[in-house]
Amino acid sequence: MWGRKGLSQDSRIWAWRTLMAGSIAAAAMPVAASAADMESRFKAPPAAYDWTITVGVEGKVEPIFQGSKDFTVRPNPLFDIRRYGTPERFRAPRDGIGFGLFEGSNFQIGPVGQIRIGRRESDDRSALHGLGNVPWAGEIGAFAEYWFVPWLRARAEVRQGVTGHHGLVADLTADAVVPVTRQLTLSGGPRATLVTAAANRPYFSIDDIQSAASGLPVYSAGGGLRSVGAGAQARYFWTPQIATHVFVEYDRLTGDVADSPLVTQRGSPDQVTIGFGITRSFDIKQPW
């Protein structure tokens, strides 16, 4: 390639192409590095947590048994779980323990459960004498709630009894939710409960043996509308994680439940519950 006149024409072309390719590569390197740096800079960091869990307890002054005219004090556990970063879901006193599997801007659908306290003769020997014991009832099912406007929620729960009774229970509620201040929220609205006969019988029916032992007439309770009523609640956030609440719920027993001799002769169709509770929220990272 070398001659007295220097590089040949082919060699000069090859050298020029090599020089240009190197220059382009050198210029592209900082651009690529800058693009990678920009991508890492603007990429959202992973969330610090995955879930927010709320736990708590409340004490309730309530009828000794459903239909009772006398009262007792009982504790009640509280639990809720939601995705980290989402606002806390409003909870009314009647709401069961559950979480939303399907969510939108104004609705939730998901599983729910409740525990119904059992009944023992020793709880009220005068009213329950001869009626025997009824075990606690676990109820599992589903709920759906819908916000018509930001201050009005409707909710329905349908649950199947798996212990204590084996009937269906449906709770229907509506609540007006009014934030008075950033810390204080007031709420309240109507309530209704419908049940099948299988959910009523263990608590309000009286068979031949129970009748002979208690002196109450034989009675078979059917299903239908068990109660109607209303409730109200006040909730106050002391910190973003800690809140307390107080509530009152009133139910008027109806239908076959109100006609049960246990209610007409030894109890009352008017049922009042008053409660006070405290909750604490925790943010957690999913372990897997």
Q: Where are the predicted features?
A:
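Cleavable N-terminal export/targeting peptides
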Residues: 1-48, 267, 283-288
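Outer-membrane beta-barrel transmembrane domain signature
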Residues: 36-37, 85, 98, 161-269, ...
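Residues that define the transmembrane beta-barrel architecture of outer-membrane proteins
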Residues: 51, 61, 71-77, 134-140, ...
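Transmembrane beta-strand segments that form the barrel wall of outer-membrane beta-barrel proteins
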Residues: 55-63, 88-96, 125-129, 152-162, ...
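Surface-exposed strand-loop-strand hairpins of Gram-negative outer-membrane beta-barrel proteins
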Residues: 63-76, 121-136, 223, 256-262
